[in-house]
From Swiss-Prot:
Residue span(s) of domain HD: 66-273
Natural source organism: Salmonella choleraesuis (strain SC-B67)
Oligomeric and partner information: Homotetramer.
Cofactors, names only: Mg(2+)
Keyword terms, alphabetized: Hydrolase, Magnesium
Protein name per the record: Deoxyguanosinetriphosphate triphosphohydrolase
GO BP: dGTP catabolic process
EC number assigned by the record: 3.1.5.1
Molecular function terms from GO: dGTPase activity; magnesium ion binding
Taxon lineage: Bacteria, Pseudomonadati, Pseudomonadota, Gammaproteobacteria, Enterobacterales
Similarity comment: family membership: Belongs to the dGTPase family. Type 1 subfamily.
SMART domains named among the record's database cross-references: HDc
Gene3D superfamilies documented for this protein: Hypothetical protein af1432 (1.10.3210.10), putative deoxyguanosinetriphosphate triphosphohydrolase like domain (1.10.3410.10)
Transmembrane segments: none
Gene coding for it: dgt
Amino acid sequence: MASIDFRNKINWHRRYRSPQGVKTEHEILRIFESDRGRIINSPAIRRLQQKTQVFPLERNAAVRTRLTHSMEVQQVGRYIAKEILSRLKEQNRLEEYGLDALTGPFESIVEMACLMHDIGNPPFGHFGEAAINDWFRQRLHPEDAESQPLTHDRCVVSSLRLQEGEENLNDIRRKVRQDICHFEGNAQGIRLVHTLMRMNLTWAQVGGILKYTRPAWWRGPVPDSHHYLMKKPGYYLSEEKYIARLRKELQLAPYSRFPLTWIMEAADDISYCVADLEDAVEKRIFSVEQLYHHLYHAWGHHEKDSLFELVVGNAWEKSRANTLSRSTEDQFFMYLRVNTLNKLVPYAAQRFIDNLPQIFAGTFNQALLEDASGFSRLLELYKNVAVEHVFSHPDVEQLELQGYRVISGLLDIYQPLLSLSLNDFRELVEKERLKRFPIESRLFQKLSTRHRLAYVEVVSKLPTDSAEYPVLEYYYRCRLIQDYISGMTDLYAWDEYRRLMAVEQ
């Protein structure tokens, strides 16, 4: 196995206008400080304040949004990164691993990956994702393109139907149909950072948010060696060339992951498990006492000094000992969070170090907190109680169904733009308004300028006389609609749906 040298992974170069003549530790750190500024000041981060964590359209500011959740993940990620570096320093291995001059960038990449990890999520979270994918599947039917051309291909777009004698073009059609029907928040995050926002971040920083390594157009089973890393789509066909360059710059083998991404993932796992339960208590779905009993019974067999007693039991006893009963909730979650972090962060850090050869190679095929340990069991306990008692609550399910309907309805509203012929849509893009298409013209005007420009830029580079042109033009037109709707906040999507459905003035 190749030696571990993080100087080959923490690549501070950029896709465009890359800094030259960088030599000192301070100069390298300044480059990553620039990344921090670009990320923190980006509109994509600001929009997280009105996107769902668990409870859509929530007016109670004490309940988490995607932004407050991401800030908490950022802090936990920083904690894990510092713990890793501290342990490596104690073992005199920082220099051996090429980290002696890169501790600052190491921490910064992890922090900013944590802050960005949800930026691609659509309104209403996973139900927004499901709505987008279901809507496009019902029109493109990618499963009908799996075999040789079918006489009963249900795809409503003629240019995407498989044709006899067009093997190469049919491969592209299959890719496009599969890709469009696999919208995913992590893949959209890559697209936002590179294509839409043009943030021009360092290669290492973007590597930190490439959580899954499966292309969205992938068909068939994934290799056993990468089944975890490829369990979801990680990037789209539209970013294929960029990801290929990213892999080259970060020395990543096909379908392998950037090492620091495991830290971001662990920070997210630790953060949301406790946060979801705290938000449920804030929403009065259950009381702290009820939550404790849910956790107690779900744990199963109890022993003195078990991990449950050291973490959950300790938090419960300390919160009850507080004479200010009105603060029991705050006290319980403060102790629960502290106890959880004090157990899981050192464990995650040690797992990273113990498995560093595989992690550095990008092939460690599981999460840091996914094993047979009691620490993994504790996280699963939090998740299972949330699934059983929070996500299945009627109020939560009703909001999720409303979110699904809103996103589906918005796609229905913008569908006329996808129904235009290639020539008609091209003319609409050039002139921005066409008298013979009054509805389509008004819908086109509502699209974000940023998204329209991204479409124009990529389509203008396609050779118009090639057989691929109609297929790829339609692909990028679908991306345009997905970009616009997925970029909305929950409140904007809700209001836009009501306005366009004439529910309110």
